[in-house]
């Protein structure tokens, strides 16, 4: 396998014409994988990783059952007091693993969707994908328990939501105005169906599932963590292969096709992968709103780099969700709320900002 770092041309040229190269090196893995190494992105990624580790340490150490920071290394290695081991293995550890994995999945799903639609509003949240996945998960869990696994129900619901939006808009998820209107309609129908299933068809379980409907990380287990991290493990190799074609796709279909990226196939693969990641996240934590909308936008502004910024979007998504979960566990204002309510409040403000910005630019 050819493994090396070099500057590579981004477009073909006729003989005698200088070939344009990116202003940053490219890591090549074999013939088909080329990953840009943007210096600012590397620095930002390292900073985000440090912040994520700090938020994770705070999650494990704060509160009545928290593990003191001085004892955290020993407890993580399997030593320490029984109460601390119990808190790590049964309470804080699974919740943290689910929060980080769900944030990564939502960040990646949003980055893929926004990149292939070339639209900052082209988020799984806005088009009703999360709500559709939540409806499918609720239906599988309550109406077909033991017959259809919850992740499969979420996947079916998410796929159906995307198909309906694409069919209604008739523009392949590209027109921002139609995308928003269709997404709002699909999300409203999916949420209505979810509430109907939870409150009418399964009244005895409504109280237990009320938090899940709004997006919650409470009472998570290692099984939930395994579900979302397995989906990520399966998706990462595909993401590595898709990173280059997705970046070229942002330049337009004609240029992407001319450079061998096959825009239509790239778009289809990215949407399918986004649906799978969103479904995995929703199946373990419920429809947590607006992480997939805000994480890619924050990553793009921090890095100032072209392309989908997949790695940074994943880190920002994890940091947002772990921090939001930390807030609902310990902040007096948000304590006790499902984490999805907090992300909805913050993300709703950001969505309003995006709508105003796109309207002023004449894109709505």
Identify the function of each model-found stretch.
Residues 2-364:
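Alpha-helical transmembrane segments in inner-membrane proteins
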